[in-house]
Amino acid sequence: MLASRFESPWFRNYVKSKLRTDPLYPTVWEELKGTTLPLLDLGCGLGLSAFFLRHCGFEAPIVGIDYDEPKIYAAQKIAEQFYPGTTFCHGDAREGIPDYSGSVIILDILQFFEEPEQRRLLESAAHNVASGGRLVIRCGLRDQSWRFRITYFGDHVARATRWMKAAPSCYPTREFLCEILENAGLEGDVRPLWGKTPFNNYLLSYSRP
């Protein structure tokens, strides 16, 4: 049902494939289902994470930000019709993120930022995590595995087909991410999250005590 709400056949097929093969969305729900705080979705794309959370019963306000205008337009159109309390805005996280108090998700976008930009984004996101809130991140981590090589290739294909507006510029390491989040006073863990995909994706789930 969720995929059918997108007018574009390309978007519909993409959503169907993601929901069928990617464990990201039910995993994010498991991380957030006990919270009642507002949610900020940085790099929200088509809004799929927000819409999935709504279907699962997440009731707090959700704000999504992305710099891909066609995706934001499609997401906002669906939100206005079906999902009250869900808002999508055009914006570039490189230029800063709004002050927010709640939980934050950053899914599959960090590799498109240079390392100093990653640090600024993560420090800002961590600052916006309220007491009892969560910061949930998924990204491809840089290591020596075959999965990382496939991840690198896949991201360049996404750019070549214009699905993504930029090519990847810097894949973070686990140590780099954990250091930033822990220095910001958050506590959490890191675990693999690749499901039926060949990509080197990991989930970082952190909270503020």
Give residue spans per PLM region.
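Class I (Rossmann-like) S-adenosyl-L-methionine-dependent methyltransferase catalytic domain
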Residues: 1-37, 46-97, 116, 136-209
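Alpha/beta-hydrolase fold active-site loops
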Residues: 101
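Short catalytic micro-motifs in class I SAM-dependent methyltransferases
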Residues: 108-109
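Conserved beta-strand/loop positions that form the S-adenosyl-L-methionine
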Residues: 42
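A short glycine-rich, Lys/Arg-flanked "PGG" loop and its adjoining helix->strand segment in the class I
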Residues: 119-131
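A conserved beta-strand element that flanks and buttresses the S-adenosyl-L-methionine
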Residues: 105
